[in-house]
Amino acid sequence: MKLLKVSRERRQTLYFLAISRGIPAITVMREIDVSRIVAGGLQRSMTAITIKAISEALRQFPQLNAMIRFGSDSTLICPDNISTRVTLEKVLNGVSGVYSRVISNTDRLSVADIERALQQFKQEDAATSEHYEKIRLIQRLPPLLAGLLLRLAMLSPTRQAETWGSFTMTSLGKNSPDACIPISGSTFTFTLGLINEKLSRNSHDVAMSHVANLSMIFDHRVLDGRLASEFLAQIKSNMEGFALESSS
């Protein structure tokens, strides 16, 4: 047996998990019929479509575009725009780690605009991109100092809002499980499970549909279960009623 330290290229995950640890999170889940999206050949844009559907739902529930201020249990930060934090897996020095980027005004962007941003994020090099410069610095610092600096940064409401976004969207790619419940740092964190085929029956016939589980992890300090269920139902309605022409 031997003891090893966690690779410094993954330290940012440890620090963000430490910040998120105290959030009283609850998970709710709905099955989404994505048959129209699949029929339109837009499976590759599923993450962008989901982000758009959530952003539009958040615009319909503006009181939910809020987060508890770091270090407080009763003060809300209410951002001026709807933004999406996206997590990505990147390799730095041969070590795979989780990184994140934020897209602003996702309720105003088209699905195509969101998809272009996602593709740009995927192409960025964790070793050279200026967007990950602060993360690389944190990775190099002694753990105690890095953790302290991150916590100090979160004391700024503006920095906190810019870091976490209105919600987080995380995806595990083509090998995604049917459902995933991650630890949440944002007020909301969403994951879309693997798309599966399912027999659906109605009064006329039996048809094959495509479905996926959408998990929503939310901060119970910001909202209660009933409102969370209504919010998730609106997201489901937005996704299932997705207009194919809106992706262009």
Region roles according to the model:
Residues 1-248:
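C-terminal catalytic/motor cores of large multi-domain enzyme assemblies
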